[in-house]
């Protein structure tokens, strides 16, 4: 009998580590993107809110950009080394800075520290400033990450092509306007099912960069490779009808950091005296008028519970074209890992 070879057709699927978790205790939702590099998790309204000429739209949302992690046990075995066991996966790595609070029987446990070692998804250690007198800490104990890199937390009215939102990158808060009206010079040839885009009289090495988002015939594509001025590769593969002479537009996020907000920097020194604490739940507000040249405003409820707008984007007499492709926008929350994050950030939101 001749030797026979058999094979079974197999496939490998990536499994996302992100999650949406309903919070039945307060009606909120917890979102995590997981630890996978370059992963994104999004929660968006099914409906796009239709902009009507002559009217503005206001959006409000309750959000915590850097929520706490609940500590289950906190102990010290007669030394300054403290062992933390969390109720849920802590998501932090060795060397991360965090602030622990809520210990009532020995304040030596409380404070800002650096993670010394990570045992597993639920246990890590840190070195306190001294040796706690109490072996086991008591109280409603929790911790916040002090900073991170490689991930952004967002909330506002936006999609992949247009919109506005707050963005927290682990260190700074930003007001962001997203627009996809910038046309790239030259034209492109696109083929259905192919990720290769060929240009005609294009200058893609100077007008695009790897990681940029583009819009081709209404669909968003991410630039993953720039071969030369006339050839780029995008993901996902082009989904539309094969064509030539196609205009490519670039998605641009215009970011203004908190210390440059033009009404109040929300650090306690501005006109409203409001000091933004990203570790606390916030009522965030946005409103906008479009007409192609309207204005976008960003705000919060201040220390007196009053809505105060802290930054705005003006467009009339400044831009040369409309600041959105469309004024129709959804409400949206999102966490994006732009590399390998130093922690697994999450956000809490309520309402929408």
Model regions and ranges:
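Extracellular/lumenal carbohydrate-interaction signature centered on repeated Trp-anchored short motifs
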Residues: 48-58, 90, 273-280
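Short, aromatic/His-centered strand-loop micro-motif at the edge of beta-sheets
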Residues: 253-283
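Small/polar beta-strand repeat architecture
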Residues: 70-96, 101-144, 182-252
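Localized edge beta-strand/strand-to-loop motifs within extracellular or lumenal beta-rich domains
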Residues: 279-295, 301-303
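Amphipathic alpha-helical scaffolding segments
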Residues: 156, 296-312
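Low-complexity, Ser/Thr/Pro/Gly-rich disordered linker/stalk regions
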Residues: 1-69, 144-181, 253-259, 315-352
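Solvent-exposed serine/threonine-rich low-complexity stretches and specific carbohydrate-binding patches
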Residues: 113-115, 311-318
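Extended, low-complexity, turn-rich repeat/linker tracts enriched in Gly/Pro/Ser/Thr and Asp/Glu
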Residues: 65-69, 106-108, 290-294
